A protein has these predicted regions:
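Residue-level marker of beta-strand positions
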Residues: 142-143
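Short hydrophobic interaction/assembly module
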Residues: 44-74
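Conserved short histidine dyad/triad with adjacent acidic residue
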Residues: 69-114, 148-150
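Conserved small/polar residues in nucleotide/adenosyl-binding loops
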Residues: 172-174
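N-terminal leader/capping segments at the start of a protein or of a new domain
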Residues: 1-56
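A short beta-strand-loop-beta hairpin characteristic of the jelly-roll/cupin
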Residues: 106-139
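Ligand-binding loop in jelly-roll beta-barrel domains
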Residues: 65-66, 74, 128, 135, ...
Length: 174
């Protein structure tokens, strides 16, 4: 994957600031999450040379911040017991500082809930979005606006599913 980040030089002219792979990734053994860019709610200084994605990968953005990321969901092999899936999911969420987001995993081990509005596009694959009381099958280029609900993603295909997401920290009112 190639990531191109633009900015300005000290004359105010537009330039390419970064051109290369994502600075950080995690969990390639179970799919993978690749940080493309983050904001922290502060002013954007487009002349700096700081790679905003080159920091520890945490699921949710900070107050006023955003996360722009690419993630991959691998198919689940047949016959994996639920207790093993619960353990794998718990470990994966702990690695991204999100164990506390797993509020109710009875329906699926990867169920989680964040205080974010997420814009997600399925690029490749056959994925089901699981909610507490609903499920919807997604095809490439389907778009989900995920408004702080308890949810999980399941790959129904034989090869990795590829998704892109923007997460925005938000107060969610029910």
């Amino acid at each position: 994957m190639r990531r191109i980040i633009t900015g300005h030089n000290n004359k105010g002219e537009s330039i390419i600031s970064f051109d290369g792979p994502p600075a950080r990734s995690i969990g390639e053994d179970v799919g993978g999450l690749f940080e493309l860019w983050n904001t922290d709610g502060d002013d954007v200084i487009s002349t700096d040379e700081i790679d905003r994605a080159d920091e520890d990968i945490i699921l949710s953005p900070p107050n006023g911040g955003t996360k722009f990321r690419y993630f991959q969901i691998n198919p689940i092999p047949d016959g994996v017991p639920d207790d093993v899936m619960q353990e794998i999911a718990a470990d994966a969420f702990e690695k991204i500082g999100a164990g506390h987001h797993r509020v109710d995993t009875r329906k699926h081990p990867a169920m989680h809930k964040t205080e974010t509005i997420d814009y997600i596009i399925l690029l490749k694959g056959d994925v089901t979005l699981i909610l507490d009381n609903d499920e919807v099958n997604l095809k490439p280029f389907d778009v989900v606006v995920q408004r702080g609900t308890n949810h999980a993603w399941v790959n129904n295909g034989d090869e990795p599913a590829l998704l892109i997401a923007v997460l925005i920290l938000s107060l969610i009112h029910i």
